[in-house]
């Protein structure tokens, strides 16, 4: 398990709530998840 990836996602979720830009954050999370799957 890559704990750094989960930590990054948690930070992204917190950032989404703080700046209210959930669409951009979700796009970043999806991109990060795809990168995690392929690498």
From Swiss-Prot:
Alphabetic keyword roster: Cell inner membrane, Cell membrane, Membrane, Transmembrane, Transmembrane helix
Main location: membrane
Subcellular location: Cell inner membrane
Induction trigger: Expressed in both exponential and stationary phase; expression is higher in exponential phase (at protein level).
Membrane topology: Single-pass membrane protein
Domain of life: Bacteria
Keyword Cell cycle applies: no
Cellular component terms per the entry's GO annotation: plasma membrane
Residues that span the membrane, as ranges: 13-35
UniProt protein name: Protein YkiC
The species this protein was found in: Escherichia coli (strain K12)
Gene that specifies this protein: ykiC
